Amino acid sequence: MTDTISNKLTNAIEGWSAPDIGPDIPHGDMPGDKIVINAAHIEKARIIFPRLLPLLKNAMEQNGAPRAVAAVCGGSGVGKSETASLLAHYLQQIGVGCYVLSGDNYPWRIPAQNDAERLRIYRCGGIRGLLTANCYTAERSAALMELMEKELDASAEQTKGHPWLTVYQQAARDALSGYLGSSKEQDFDQLTDIISRFKRGDTHIWLKRMGRTPEALWYEKVDFSQVSVLIIEWTHGNSEKYQGVDIPILLNSTPEETREH
């Protein structure tokens, strides 16, 4: 690790105070992504950052180069994007270059198509569950299609009037759990390759950009020559299905926060 980066981290470890938040704070690279920072995000980042610094220094020493990778992960609505942006801002303020990569660029499908695939898997899995349990009848099929049309087939409330729906919902959740966060949904190999290129010292790396329509797909050549820390902000940031993350940072969220998001 270069003395310059090492010294900057050491100085910050020995004495750091949170800087002001300016209008040009770094943010993730998901097209159209916007961050809204509030007091809770700042509090989280201020708690994390002093603990992150020695971990980054140690990771760089182990990597044998002034580069390290952290991942900010957690459920929807927990503030991954905002917290990652604040950590990047704090690093830049002490003179350590940082880039925030959004893992949301790396599903195989655009959001609308992925939502449709999740729904297909959920419903097909639920129906197969009814068949396996010998709970499927023509009458229940008609009732289920009506619930699907109203988007109520996943509602726990509906099981009161349709007890067999409990079997459907459990089987549907089991089927969906095999897809969410799997290699069928996310391109983990591409992220592993990006991390590998970053750690080996590549100065420029092509990064994926994905919008919300099928044609909104392109790559952008990003300059990493002055970047020492790559922060990946992503729900699946601590997944074992890709390699190279030195420091996973898990943000806790409540069910209410997730539903609100």
Identify what each model region corresponds to.
Residues 2-50:
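Charged, amphipathic alpha-helical linker segments immediately N-terminal to NTP-binding catalytic cores
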Residues 37, 98-100, 106-214:
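Conserved nucleotide-sensing/catalytic segment adjacent to the nucleotide-binding pocket
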Residues 59-67:
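Phosphate-binding P-loop
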Residues 77:
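Walker A (P-loop) phosphate-binding loop of P-loop NTPases
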Residues 80:
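Conserved lysine of the Walker
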Residues 83, 87:
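Hydrophobic positions on the alpha1 helix immediately C-terminal to the Walker A/P-loop
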Residues 89-99:
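Post-Walker A helix-loop "phosphate-sensing" segment adjacent to the P-loop in P-loop NTPases
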Residues 156, 160-168, 216-261:
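ATP-dependent NMP and nucleoside kinases share a basic, alpha-helical "lid"
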